[in-house]
Amino acid sequence: MTYYWAILSGIEGNLAAYEAVLADIQRQRHPVDELYILGDVIAATPESTKVIQRIQSPRANEPVPQVCQGWWEEQLLILHGLGRTGEPTELIERYGMDMVKTLWDAIPREMVEWVRSLDFGFFELDCLLIHGSSVSVSDELTPDTPPIQMLDRLMRMDANTLFCGRSGLTFQYQIQQGTVTSSVITLDKVISPQATQVRPRQIVGVGNVGRIPGQATYTLYHPNSNRIEFKTVRYGSGKGFQTVDRRIQ
């Protein structure tokens, strides 16, 4: 039987969008065996608690979600003194000081412990699944990211495919087979250049579920064939559920 992975990111407290994606997953012709959520389950909204509860209680016919931390989760942990830095600098720079209290009030303490328990990312088969990259959750990879930076993010974990969600975009960025030459220059000498063979690899942006009202995007992946499908689900009053597919071999 042909099994797929469903990979999504950025629910951002939007329960209706998450439900629309789950319903679309159930309608797929091929069964979805694994469900990965690459962070930003929450945002600074009280509805985030309902999303967490829904993730914690999958229905009998649904795959159990595997969830890792995203940018919003990291900001929440920082506020509670559980993050890797002491101050919510990024949160304040992006949204202002008022957002500190808004995020604090949105997520009850008992759910902070659930957020704290989440992994930083997953490595399955030859795939790294993570919100940003192995550098940080804030590392935003896009189709415009320089190739050498993309290659660095892949080679840090020796992954053939890196699935990420920080940008919110759906994209496939392929790196062809080749050679990378590097050298080290010190004050007194130059070390001979070293050549490293690079095999074909790719970075995949998995989309964003909850940011745009009425439209959710996510990714289906077939590990055996390396096939990728980008899915767009339109939902809401008067729309029912509509799905737009983009298949990439």
Give residue ranges: language-model regions.
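N-terminal active-site segment of His-dependent metallophosphoesterases
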Residues: M1-R54, P58-N61
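Beta-strand-turn-beta hairpins that frame and shape the catalytic cleft
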Residues: M1-A6, F122-L128, Q197-I203
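Active-site neighborhood of phospho(di)ester-bond hydrolases with catalytic His/Asp-centered motifs
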Residues: L8-S9, L35-D40, Q66-W71, I130, ...
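His/acidic metal-ligating clusters that form di-metal
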Residues: Q28-P31, W104-Q176, V180
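Active-site environment of divalent metal-dependent phosphoester hydrolases
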Residues: E12-A17, A43-P46, W72-L77, V135-V137, ...
